[in-house]
Amino acid sequence: MSKKPLDFLRIYDWHKTEAMNKISKLDFERIIPKHFSKEIKNKHLSVKITGNWKIWKLTDEGEGQYPIFKCIVEDGFLKIKNECGNKKYSLDNAWIKICTKIKYDNENGKDIYSIDEKNLTLYSVNNSFNSKYKNNIVDAFLDNLLIACIEDNIKDLNKFFKLYKVKTAIKEDLSLLGWDTGYSTSFTHVNKTIENQQNYPKQFKYESEGPYNIDISGEFDSWRLTTGSDGQNVNFICPIKNGEFNFLGTEYKFSQGEQVNIQLKLKYLNIEEPTFEDSTSLNDGNQVDLIVKTDEDENENPPVTIIKVVLLGEIDAIGKMLLEGTFREWFNENIDAFKQIFSSFLLEDTSKNPDFQWLKPTKAYYGVASAEPIDGKPDLDSSVFSVMSMVEDNKNDKPSHTVDGRILDAVNNESAFGIRTPLFVKKWLIAGLEMMQIGKLEDFDLINNGMGFINNKKLLFGTFENADGEDVPAYVEKDNFRLEITNNQLKIEITDIYWQQSRRLTGHVMYSQYFDLELRSGTDITGAEYKNILIPVENSEPTLVVNISQDEFDIWGDIVGEIVGGIVVGIVTGYLGSILGKGVGKYLEKFLTKTSGGRWVLKMNKEMYDYLNNLFKGDRRVFNEVAIDEIELISTLGTSQAISTIANTPTNFASKIWVNKSKFIGGLIGGSVGSVIPSVIIKSIDAWDKQNYSVLPSINAFVASSVGSVKWPDTSEFKIESAELNGIFLLGGKLERYEK
């Protein structure tokens, strides 16, 4: 499966679209012809429909690119004429619900939504006829003839649809759309399971008494998922292996390549006796299985919708309608024979590792997303079948079956597991914050979007020895420290750290650093193999801005150049020597720019970064040793006293930044096992420093706890191959089958 660039995700809100658009009857009549009529016949039978439209409406039942219209008839009739006579059915106030596919275009900056006439999809979801007449044959005649009338005026339907202002939302990054977790696989994988387990009905047989002399029998080949639907609607192809259809004295032989395309919904069923175990939990929860829904939905739509019957041989229009009506009745009566379990959840389960309890689901949902065809053929590898969940009894305010269809392309694999970023922040990124030891956890709040933390009070950041040989406090004011995820990167940002650097100089420094999360496997410096280690990696030079007042600039050559040089060189290289040479201050002076507020600003750039790294070589291992000593204080002094002791222990600005960075990295590595135990963090910092990666904890235990409560029916195990931040915390991998 080739990796594709991710387009924007367009989320259609048909509830809001329906509620916020009220199309008048006058507008409707201006576009849609009032009268409709259609007739078909053969030597045995003629069927005619005629009537007048009352109104068409867009409903709120659509999913993804597939809106549903309700077309209401004012008056009319269906007339069936055969050798036994005539029969007339009233259409007064009858209705039909139809589904079609729309496409999106942008013309001169304006969003345009229209029915895809070139690749037209148009089928009946439900109607009022069957409940009234209880006759699937009459139902099929009415459905097909009304759809034919609408299809004849498809351009008018398109004009009518364009009266609606379609409400959508755009997501650039991947999204779980309010769900805490999502576990996805491809249609291809699901189809392999269906084929192997063969839980679909193998045979079909149906006879009907009455004037049409219908009987049908035959065998199905393996049913399979196909594209053409989104959300809760799941499309299947039911290939016909062999069989025959007899109607009105005519025999039609089925052949290979013919099929019935149907649409189903699924539901979760409580299971009293669990059928699988989660090796990472106590298995004290309740199991639910995702199976075919066999009754009407909340909109009273039947469990099975016949989208189309594909035939290769010669059969007239009446015969095909009779066949469709017969299949409609058979499928709705026999769909409970489709025993496939699509997924199973253990809900409300207890994790063996309390630090991973937050990964255990408490509510389950499902959804599908169809990928666009490739060369006219369904793209089953990129089409997504997903099971979503909430954890810790969290609530999804707008629960939806909508699935981000880009997720498999993003991992370039057959399966993916995602965690909503604010949940990742609260449960994993917080370990990095806590281990930095710049404040107690209660000194920080979640930022409004849930993507990180911000300090809620003034913090004593550290104690620095200044140019006069004095130990002075360095502060960070409220809201000036942020640890967050932005642009799919981890970011540490301190807007202003300030301290009295000399009698005439107050140091003001803005510092930020970005990190990527990388999943690494390989051989470490000792020759030992390691696998699936998640490590934060600096992805660029840090951002450093030093502010200098006009008075301070006047003494640049004597004092400020050396002081600022020490800060910059220390941050960039880790070199903490007291003698830099006059050339460094002179070199940095050329990067000073004056602001409109009368201050001078020194911003580090790549040229400066490379120049200083070539000039100075610091021993960064010293900082890791200090970081380890500071983490050990948690065990001896406790968290609060350790933070206070560290903040009041004299150091310098550069050392403080480097040590905090080491502790942050150690905290995140420790998060792989859900732990902020000092011994684990110390071990992580030491191994990371020495590039002894085989000693670091892998992400495997986390992955096992993440997916352990969810089971695909083919007893497959998720084998992780990638991890990244991409709107969500995203794990990609393969599903490897194993024997029970």
UniProtKB/Swiss-Prot annotation:
According to its UniProt record, what is one Pfam family this protein matches? Clostridium_P47
Give one GO molecular function term.
toxin activity
- Inducing stimuli: Part of both a high- and low-molecular weight complex with other proteins from the ptox and cry loci. Encoded in the ptox locus, possibly in an ntnh-orfX1-orfX2-orfX3-pmp1 operon.
User: What's in the keyword line of the UniProt record?
Assistant: Plasmid, Virulence
Q: Which InterPro entries match?
A: Clostridium_P47
Miscellaneous section: P.bifermentans strain Cbm (subsp. malaysia) is toxic to Anopheles mosquito 3rd instar larvae and less toxic to Aedes aegypti larvae.
What does this protein do, in the record's words?
Expression of the ptox operon (ntnh-orfX1-orfX2-orfX3-pmp1) in B.thuringiensis kills Anopheles but not Aedes mosquito 3rd instar larvae. The ntnh-pmp1 construct is about half as toxic.
State the family it belongs to: Belongs to the TULIP P47 family.
**Designated name of the protein:** Protein OrfX2
Organism of provenance: Paraclostridium bifermentans (Clostridium bifermentans)
